[in-house]
From Swiss-Prot:
UniProt keyword list: Cytoplasm, Methyltransferase, rRNA processing, S-adenosyl-L-methionine, Transferase
Signal peptide: none
Organism: Caulobacter vibrioides (strain NA1000 / CB15N)
Pfam families, A to Z: GidB (PF02527)
Main location: cytoplasm
Protein name: Ribosomal RNA small subunit methyltransferase G
Function description: Specifically methylates the N7 position of guanine in position 527 of 16S rRNA.
Any Gene Ontology CC annotation: cytosol
């Protein structure tokens, strides 16, 4: 999968299209399909994702999450902040399963969403650790910290500060208003950032963040 290759806005993948684009194995597709089923079932009793997005799962959720791995191909330790729906964390764990030393920390403050993550992790035998905690209260040593639909950049950087200060690089999935969010965030934070176009939606962006510190 090429990091800068984006789909057309109207493109919708199925499992075969996702597999061809990402290079996923048959076993990974089986796990991702099972995750789609669990996500749909649990979404009926708790608000995990927009219900209409289940139909576009392979693009909106699977590809949106999977596109992060080529941006950090050597990373084995990941933290997903606000991981309640398992996106991107569960998808990353499925694709990293079997890699030596791989672990994805799923950080979620809502206990009922942690229960969902526990069911998924057990069902799919994933290399994850689930933390029922506030992201900013943990001190985890990871290579990459990520989040999707978690908070505006100013607040998100506050959540991610302990990880970024401990050597992690941030890879955050954001929407088309990210440049406004970044401008606002620079009033409170100093950091290096790089934007990439999302492969799953050319209107979306992936924000890479390094060297974070508070504005003095």
């Amino acid at each position: 999968m090429q990091p800068d290759l984006a789909l057309a806005p109207e493109a919708v993948l199925d499992a075969a299209g996702f597999q061809a684009l990402v290079g996923a194995t048959d076993a990974q597709i089986e796990d991702l399909t099972r995750f789609q089923t669990l996500l749909a079932e649990w979404n009926e009793v708790m608000n995990l994702v927009g219900p209409l997005t289940i139909a576009t799962y392979w693009t909106r959720h699977a590809l949106d999450s999977a596109q992060l791995i080529p941006l950090a191909p050597e990373a084995t330790a990941w933290a997903d902040l606000g991981a309640g729906a398992g996106l991107p964390g569960v998808v990353l764990a499925i694709l990293l399963k079997g890699r030596a030393g791989a672990k994805v920390h799923l950080v979620e403050s809502m206990i009922k969403r942690c229960r969902f993550l526990e069911v998924v992790a057990k069902d799919l035998d994933l290399p994850v650790q689930i933390h029922n905690a506030r992201a900013e209260d943990l001190k985890l040593k990871v290579d990459i910290v990520t989040a999707r639909a978690c908070a505006p950049m100013t607040k998100l950087l506050g959540f991610a500060e302990p990880y970024l200060r401990n050597g992690a690089v941030g890879l955050f999935l954001k929407g088309q208003d990210v440049e406004t969010e970044l401008s606002e965030a620079r009033k409170a934070w100093t950091f290096e950032s790089e934007l990439r176009t999302s492969q799953s939606d050319p209107r979306g962006r992936i924000v890479q963040v390094k060297r974070l510190s508070r504005v003095r």
